[in-house]
Regions:
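Amphipathic alpha-helical recognition patches that constitute DNA-binding helices
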Residues: 1, 9, 13, 155, ...
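Short cysteine clusters
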Residues: 18, 22-25, 210, 230-231, ...
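Conserved alpha-helical substructure of the radical SAM core
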Residues: 1-112, 122, 126-134, 138, ...
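Conserved C-terminal portion of the radical SAM core fold
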Residues: 9, 13, 52-60, 81-88, ...
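C-terminal accessory region of radical SAM enzymes
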Residues: 138-141, 145-153, 174-202, 226-227, ...
Length: 292
């Protein structure tokens, strides 16, 4: 188990809200109080990354980033301070518009993931009832228009929860290809049993390791500055520290963080409970079918 002095990737919320109410997501059942990250904490995160060996910033975490009306300005601050860092964004596409997309095209975004969980109106509404189907597809075509000639990798993501007709995937893939996007069909992930309506029916008392190496490479920061052990911790039960009072580096190499890692990666110690519930644990035989 090797851990660098500073995370390679940082994933964080500038706020904690989402409008989509996806049936495959825990968000609507969590009862979160609305939180917005203070500008001071946001700038502290970015400023502490300067001159560090960080490869990617992901300014979203279990939320819809474009609900933040200052999100473009925040992306501009990231790009100004860290001109070489990769920036990844995932969105349900509903709060974009032509002006925002034009501004986005100027920021050298590395990867833009479009969560579009149904091709037809009916299936899209079933999967994402809080999102306007027509607006999403219009915005997707605008993204193709303005980002098509940039270096940004744009992909449409669908989640296969075994309830979606095959024709939905076929037609969405055609739409993606027509617009020059990649198409990703990912397996359903119940977020370590945080999704109420569906389940992977998985629990492993002998969990050891993480298929995606996130505890060794990626830090996750909530809108209030708290650092959680993993993005699957929707209930915020495993807090490693708070960026408001400590530095990224001091939290990352802290005794508490390292104890969690040791418990997860040891064959003899008891893994954190959240990891036992997660199909991305190293010992899970089906994790190769899930990309997330």
């Amino acid at each position: 188990m090797r851990v660098t002095r500073f995370p390679k990737i940082i994933e964080f919320q500038t706020h904690n809200r989402c409008n989509a109410n996806c049936i495959i997501c825990p968000y609507s059942s969590m009862g979160y109080k609305s939180e917005k990250m203070e500008d001071e904490i946001f700038k502290k995160i970015i400023d502490e990354c300067v001159d560090k060996r960080i490869t990617r910033l992901i300014p979203y975490l279990n939320n819809e980033p474009f609900l933040d009306k200052t999100f473009i300005q925040k992306l501009s601050y990231i790009r100004k301070k860290l001109p070489q860092v990769e920036i990844e964004i995932s969105t349900n596409v509903s709060f974009l518009n032509e002006n925002l997309i034009i501004e986005l095209s100027k920021l050298n975004i590395t990867e833009l993931r479009l969560s579009m969980f149904g091709f037809t109106y009916r299936m899209h509404h079933i999967m994402m009832p809080g999102v306007d189907h027509k607006k999403v597809f219009e915005n997707a075509e605008l993204i193709a228009k303005y980002l098509g000639n940039t270096e940004c990798k744009v992909s449409i993501v669908m989640i296969d929860n075994k309830k979606i007709p095959e024709s939905e995937f076929v037609e969405m893939k055609k739409f993606a290809q027509k617009n020059g996007f990649d198409f990703c069909r990912w397996g359903f992930l119940d977020r370590a049993k945080n999704v109420k309506k569906f389940s992977n029916n998985y629990y492993d008392d002998t969990a050891s390791g993480c298929e995606q190496r996130r505890p060794l490479e990626r830090m996750h920061i909530l809108a209030d500055g708290k650092v959680i052990f993993c993005c699957q911790d929707w209930a915020h039960e495993n807090i490693m520290g708070n960026i408001g009072t400590d530095t990224i580096e001091s939290i990352w190499v802290s005794e508490r963080y390292n104890n969690y890692r040791k418990c997860l990666y040891s064959a003899t110690l008891d893994a954190p409970e959240i990891c036992k519930r997660c199909v991305l644990s190293e010992s899970c035989g089906i994790n190769g079918k899930i990309c997330n």
